[in-house]
Amino acid sequence: MVRKYIFGEPIETDAVVKELASSAWSDGVFQKKEDGFHYSLKEDEIVYGLGENVRGINKRGWRYISNCSDNPNHCENTNSLYGAHNFIMVGDGVHETYGLFVDTPGRVTFDIGYTDIDDLCISMEEENYKIYLIEAASYRDVVKEFRELIGRSYIAPRWAFGYGQSRWSYDTADEVREVAAEYKKHNIPIDSIYLDIDYMERYKDFTINRDSFADFEELVEEMRKENIHLVPIIDGGVKKEDGYGVYEEGKANGYFCKDENGEDFIIGVWPGKCCFPDMLDDKARQWFGDKYRILIDKGIDGFWNDMNEPAIFYSEKHLKEVFEKMEDYKKMNLDVNTFFEMTGMIGGICNNPEDYASFYHNYKGRRYRHDQVHNLFGYYMTRSASEAFERYVPEKRILLFSRASYIGMHRFGGIWQGDNASWWSHLKMNVKMMPSLNMCGFLYTGADVGGFGADATEDLVLRWLEFAVFTPLLRNHSARGTRRQEVYRFSHVEKFADVIGVRYQILPYIYSEYMKAALRNTMMFNPLAFLYGEDALARQVEDQLFIGENVMVAPVCEQNVSGRVVYFPERMKQLIFKNGIVEEAKVYEKGFSYVEMPMGTVHIFLREGYLFPVAKGGKCVEDVDFEDLKLYSFGEEIKPYEYYLDDGETKDFTIESHVRMLSC
């Protein structure tokens, strides 16, 4: 059961697609007080949700702030990341369980046992929002109700489930060719190569650097013949430059965000001084979306949207203030106080809260200050592209994912999990974030494999891949100035080729589970508590996940170990993928067991009575035979497997037309 409550005059977000009558609020399990909505937490209750965030799957014990933030510091004391996903679930999951969605584009704080260990408090900055309260018997039921409320998740083309290689940056066409050639030379499967900001002419959206990519169109076609898709980045700011067509059009038509005086608001990002397209304005959004056609016409069929929280390096106003203040500091004998005052001032230029309250949007017939609608910018940028694809290539699936997001954007594109680091803790965070994002509708997602920032080690990249072969978005990405982590650069290339090859063996299952989750509004990545709610031990496990209902994964997230302790919630059989072969290994009884997991092997744990389909693999998704499958199972009574298969390219995707039963 879902109830809708309206407080004040909410700003519409288009997050919800299902029409509901509103009710008058009365206190129940959630109580409305002066400082927000409160829920008394019982000792055995779990709090799930909040999508892209730090810490565990169970969100108890911290204060989270929904405020899309350009924040690469994904640490335990971080309150906000790139997404604003205002959905939580609370309860024991086997009796009455509650879901709550706060629909507002401004800042929302979720204090989940932080101030008071037994209290959950949700507070908003303004008394203008909608609350959707869901009551159901289980976690899975709550998720399904919520997902039906917010609409079907984005469906990517099947080639986008292959392995992708990225780097900030591949600076030339020849470097792209070199990457492709090295993967081919070492027999490592690959389906995509990503182009970061240096493919552009001086970081200008929808341009090509013809000095470095003189034959861009030929490069796209050449890669396509190798079954490799090029996926360029698009940023949220448009360079302020006379003679640059996109800027000239935007300025002439009034499509940029304005300051309080009605002038274009000028900020700095990669190209220097820029303007933000008013993504919330219908005409500006259509105009910006139309620009993607420039690259589509060059053969591009995938994009990633970045810097769309939106990130602000500086504003003209704050930069001027800093320069003036620096003149004063030059004359000082800086002591501990004035020195850190100076460094704090300089550091505060970037993503300054005052800047976010200094420009305006035209949205649904009204003028809003940006901070009131901040969490919609990345969502509507991605929506602009998706709606343009519907206009220009309506029957074709285009890969599209974003850094910033709000619930509702899940209908238009996926997300990657932002600028993580090459830390083992960020591998663990990737594991824990997957189900939280699924709860909020984001199915096409994954982290930068190996970590974006910092220097990766060979064992970290390999262990990360052992988990990431299960995530829909499988992309190795790293930052300029860090160690190169294309897998052919490491000592044991054969292990990387083998692990990436596993992705193509298990792809029929991964794709099938993804499509069923999207079309049925269910989870692809399940915490153990979703399947074993009455098992007190399963409810506490956070580093093992079910992919669908048939198989469990338990990734190794520690350095210098050859295995790990696994909790088996029931009797399960171990399948080991190594050297292209699947070994049906040991059967584990319910309980804790230590499992050997040597580096370079992938381990799947199959439930008794269930099937797991495996293909022969391939060097790209196009090579995989989705019909020639070997079915693995154990036990006497085996349930048929609901296998989803479509053409992977068009928008002909319905359960009724594309599911069939596989049996031993």
Regions found by a protein language model. Name each.
Residues 60, 73-75, 376-377, 382-398, ...:
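Catalytic core of carbohydrate-active enzymes
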Residues 64-68, 81-84, 177, 285, ...:
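Short, hydrophobic/amphipathic alpha-helical packing segments
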Residues 77, 96-101, 109-112, 141-143, ...:
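Short helix/loop capping segments that flank catalytic or ligand/cofactor-binding pockets
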Residues 82-86, 95-97, 105, 128, ...:
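Extracellular structured ligand-interaction cores
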Residues 189-496, 531-532:
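Aromatic- and carboxylate-enriched substrate-binding clefts and catalytic-loop regions
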